[in-house]
Design a protein with these regions (language model features):
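Short, Lys/Arg-rich, polar N-terminal cytosolic tail immediately upstream
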Residues: 1-5
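Short hydrophobic alpha-helices at membrane interfaces in multi-pass membrane enzymes
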Residues: 152-171, 206-207
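Transmembrane catalytic cores of multi-pass membrane glycosyltransferases
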Residues: 23-78, 130, 173-299, 306-315
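Alpha-helical transmembrane segments
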Residues: 8-23, 107-114, 166-167, 208-215, ...
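Signature aromatic-anchored transmembrane alpha helix within multi-pass, membrane-resident enzymes
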Residues: 286-290, 334-359
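Membrane-interface micro-motifs in multi-pass membrane enzymes
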Residues: 105-151, 259-262, 299-330
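Intrinsically disordered, polar/acidic, low-complexity terminal segments
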Residues: 8-50, 54, 64, 68-87, ...
Length: 515
């Protein structure tokens, strides 16, 4: 009974974190390149061709294809939740060098999880997009797991060679272009440090380093990378110093600013060390050195992107990972120092992050519920148009309501030919719609004529779909109050052969509609 009581808070904490991620992914439709990688399939031949002609990310590409192959929203949601939790867990456990749960983790785990959510440079595309997560969450999970084992081997002076760590080393090296070079660099620096300290090097570190370097070579030297680069003359045609200058002056600062909340969390923890003499005397200096080192590596992962013609926000997830490690090292050192001010300080920062997380999460949940409703509308249009024999048609783009920031949006990239291939037609185009049309899926239906149907809910969303273009005004009875809305003031869009109109009419039930 006592054992059960001890593990209950830990289980509840992990379960809540799991459900938080699971629920958002449950409401997330497959989108963007998810369709492309589903069509890619899981055959070795198709992935070899992909490697030779497009991308060296064999680990990420196979991960996304395997997940999408299931065509199961349950699998998608579980994979998103598990990958996020395991990623955060390795971040939490690296400073201690053990995977066993200890007292400090009751504060450290929520601190890292909350910070991962509220400071993520592009949460929608790194966590809730299957292909994006495969490229920037799963691969970074392999990297941080490798860092954990490599760090543990170093501090415990372990000599054993593990085939699993060797495989993990290769996977970490073959992660993504911003992080992979630093995996190889860290492994080489670890060998150099041991050689300097002991005048000899453990064979396991040599093996793991060679595996990591091999993974980096497979990733970076992919023929597909060179084929893609051949079409980027606007970038590669410039002298290298010009590319570096443009990157440093126009791109780096904007991308580093994306994770500003992580800097605030890190600064607050550092201030606890600086301004408390007792903490400075008792804190583990090795943890501070490790924190400084991973910050430098994190900045390096951003600087190295001068080599790439594009620098999407989601790529910053690798940089963000190293700042999370820095937060973990300092917070762990504060908690293990035994100084009350350090423990209280970490607890206070965790509570602050938790408050922001709660606000952000509720916005995200509401927003993704609405996009799930929009997906129902899109699927109905696809079914209807295919049944009518159409080979080319339009679906509305997703519309996001207010989130913490635009980084919460999943990717809106849309390839008409790929969507068409997935649904066995020639092409499916998208059209931008500047209103939330989920009310069409889950609102009350009002048949106004053979050509016109209205939809409403008690939250104030009101939409009309008509085969004829509307003019004049619409009069509504909302909770017994009359409201007149000029049609020209309603938001509108034309989807295929239909005219869509939308207005926010205030909360209440619509009981009557007339033109």
């Amino acid at each position: 009974m006592n054992t059960m009581l001890k593990i209950l808070p830990k289980t509840a904490m992990i379960l809540l974190a799991f459900l938080a991620i699971f629920l958002i992914e449950w409401y997330t439709p497959i989108h963007s390149d998810d369709y492309r990688y589903y069509l890619l399939g899981i055959s070795p031949e198709s992935h070899f061709h992909h490697y030779m002609t497009w991308s060296g990310r064999i680990i990420a590409d196979y991960t996304s294809a395997l997940i999408l192959y299931t065509r199961s929203q349950l699998v998608y949601s579980i994979s998103a939740a598990v990958s996020t939790l395991v990623f955060c867990y390795f971040i939490v456990k690296t400073p201690s060098g053990t995977l066993r749960w200890n007292k400090s983790d009751y504060l450290l785990f929520p601190l890292i999880f909350f910070t991962y959510w509220i400071s993520n440079p592009n949460l929608g595309q790194t966590t809730f997009w299957i292909v994006g997560a495969a490229n920037y969450l799963w691969t970074n999970l392999f990297v941080v797991a490798w860092l954990f084992f490599f760090y543990t081997i170093t501090i415990k002076n372990s000599k054993a060679i593990s085939p699993w760590v060797a495989l993990l080393s290769f996977m970490a090296g073959c992660s993504n272009e911003s992080v992979s070079p630093f995996v190889s660099l860290i492994s080489v620096l670890a060998i150099a440090y041991e050689l300097w300290q002991n005048k000899s090097v453990s064979r396991n570190k040599i093996v793991y380093s060679l595996c990591a370097i091999a993974g980096s070579c497979v990733l970076i030297l992919s023929p597909g990378n060179f084929i893609r680069a051949s079409g980027k003359e606007f970038w590669y045609g410039r002298p290298i110093f010009e590319r570096i200058f443009i990157h440093l002056t126009e791109r780096v600062h904007n991308h580093l600013a994306l994770i500003w909340i992580a800097y605030v969390v890190l600064l607050l923890l550092v201030l606890l060390v600086i301004f408390n003499k007792q903490i400075r005397a008792k804190i583990d200096k090795t943890s501070l050195i490790c924190a400084a080192l991973v910050v430098c590596i994190g900045i390096g992962t951003s600087l190295i992107m001068f080599a790439s013609p594009s620098y999407p926000d989601r790529v910053m997830n690798g940089t963000f990972m190293f700042f999370l490690l820095a937060i973990s090292f300092i917070a762990y050192a504060l908690l293990k120092s035994g100084v009350k001010a350090g423990v209280v300080g970490v607890a206070a920062v965790t509570v602050l992050c938790g408050i922001v997380f709660l606000w952000s999460y509720l916005l995200m949940l509401n927003g993704y519920k609405k996009t799930a409703g929009q997906e129902i509308v899109r699927q109905k249009i696809i079914t209807k148009e295919i049944a009518a024999g159409k080979q080319k048609f339009i679906i509305p783009d997703y519309y996001f309501v207010k989130l913490q920031n635009s980084g919460g949006h999943f990717g809106l990239f849309h390839d008409p030919a790929v969507y068409g291939e997935y649904y066995h037609v020639q092409a499916i185009f998208k059209k931008k719609v500047n209103f939330d049309y989920s009310v069409i899926a889950n609102g009350a239906k009002h048949s106004l004529s053979n050509e016109t149907t209205a939809y409403s809910n008690t939250r104030g969303d009101f939409a009309i779909i008509s085969r004829e273009q509307l003019t004049g005004s619409i009069t509504l009875s909302v909770n017994g109050r009359q409201k007149t809305i000029p049609v020209e003031k309603m938001k509108h869009a034309e989807i295929n052969d239909e005219f869509w109109y939308y207005a926010s009419v205030g909360k209440g039930e619509i009981t009557a509609i007339s033109f």
